[in-house]
Regions:
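Cofactor-centric catalytic regions
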Residues: 1-5, 50, 56-162, 174-282
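Mobile "lid/hinge" segments at catalytic clefts and subdomain interfaces of large enzymes
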Residues: 1-64, 202
Length: 282
C-alpha cells in the first residue's frame, strides 16, 4: 500500500474493531481504485495550484527502483515513470490542449493518472485429493466458492488428468480445520494456483493407482501404464486392464494404504522480497 509516490513523512493511525455483524463487500475491484481516485484527484489539484503540468508533477514524485516506500519497503521492478512516459507519448500529451470541443460539439479534455497494485506474489496453494473405496474422488481445497466456479473447475481438471467421469468427483466443504492452506480466494488466482495443485496431486494419484493395479496383476509397477481414458494396463500383457474407477471397488484398497495425495503450487520463485518490518510507531 505504498502508493506510487515518494512520501518521506507520514503518520497513520490504525484502529481494529471487533463485531458480530457480517459485512457486505465486493467480490472484485475494491480498495485500490477508491484510494487511487482520491490521490490522483489530489495530484491534479496540487498541479493546478502550483501551475505545473500534471504529468510533470507526477514524474518528479513517482517511486523508482531502489527508493524506500512509505512503509519502509525497498522498491523493486518499479516502472511507474516509464508507464507514464509511454502513455503520454502515445496520446500526444504535449500537443493536446487541456480542453477543447470536437466537431460534434462534445466537450473534451485530457487527463493522466497512475497507481500501483501489489502482485499477490509470493503465493502458495495446497490441496488434498483422495480416492475413495467406491472409486469416487474427493478434493479438499480452501479455495472458496463465491460464484466464480471453482467447485466446477477443480473437478474438471482432476477428471481430465485422471480420465474419470466428472460426476465421480466431488469437493469437500471449505473448513480451515481440515482443508490444506491456501493464501486467499482473491485476485482471480483460484483456477491457476489451486488448479495446478490439483494437477500435481492427480499425477501422484496416478502413480499410486498404478502401484495398486500392479499388485492386482502380479507384476512390477513399472510394467503397467496409465492410459488417457483412465485405464491401467500391463505393458507386456495389454489384456491385463482395469479402469481406475474399479480399482477402489476391487478390494485392493482394503489391504493397502489409502490413495491420498497432496498437491502444492507456488510462485515464490518469481519475486523474493527482502525481509522488512516496515515503519511503525512502537
Amino acid at each position: 500500500a505504498n502508493g506510487p509516490y515518494k512520501i518521506p513523512n507520514a503518520q497513520v493511525d490504525a484502529y481494529v474493531y471487533m463485531t458480530n455483524k457480517t459485512l457486505g463487500t465486493a467480490y472484485r475491484g475494491f480498495g485500490v481504485t477508491e484510494v487511487a481516485t482520491a490521490h490522483e484527484r489530489q495530484m491534479d489539484r496540487i498541479a493546478e495550484k502550483l501551475g505545473i503540468d500534471p504529468l510533470e508533477l507526477r514524474l518528479k514524485n513517482v517511486l523508482q527502483n531502489g527508493d524506500v516506500g512509505i512503509t519502509g519497503e525497498i522498491m523493486q521492478t518499479m516502472a511507474v515513470k516509464e508507464c507514464l512516459e509511454t502513455a503520454a507519448a502515445n496520446i500526444g500529451w504535449k500537443d493536446l490542449p487541456d480542453r477543447w470541443t470536437d466537431e460534434e460539439g462534445n466537450l473534451c479534455g485530457k487527463g493522466i493518472a497512475c497507481f500501483n497494485k501489489l502482485t499477490g506474489t509470493p503465493s502458495t496453494t495446497s490441496v488434498l485429493v483422495k480416492m475413495n473405496e467406491n472409486g469416487s474422488l474427493y478434493i479438499m481445497s480452501a479455495s472458496t466458492e463465491m460464484g466464480q466456479g471453482v467447485t466446477t473447475t477443480l473437478p474438471q481438471i482432476a477428471a481430465e488428468t485422471l480420465g474419470m467421469a466428472l460426476e465421480k468427483i466431488s469437493m469437500a466443504p471449505v473448513d480451515t480445520a481440515i482443508t490444506p492452506y491456501d493464501k486467499t480466494t482473491t485476485s482471480s488466482r483460484s483456477t491457476f494456483h489451486s488448479g495446478n495443485a490439483v494437477l500435481e496431486a492427480c499425477e501422484d494419484i496416478k502413480k499410486q493407482l498404478c502401484r495398486l493395479a500392479a499388485i492386482k496383476f502380479g507384476v512390477a509397477p513399472e510394467d503397467v501404464t496409465y492410459t488417457a481414458d483412465g485405464y491401467i494396463q500391463g505393458r507386456s500383457r495389454p489384456e491385463q486392464r482395469i479402469h481406475i474407477n474399479d480399482v477402489g471397488t476391487s478390494g485392493i484398497l482394503h489391504e493397502q494404504p489409502p490413495v491420498v495425495a497432496v498437491g502444492r503450487y507456488g510462485t515464490s520463485d518469481i519475486f523474493d522480497p527482502p525481509p522488512v518490518d516496515g515503519r511503525q510507531s512502537k
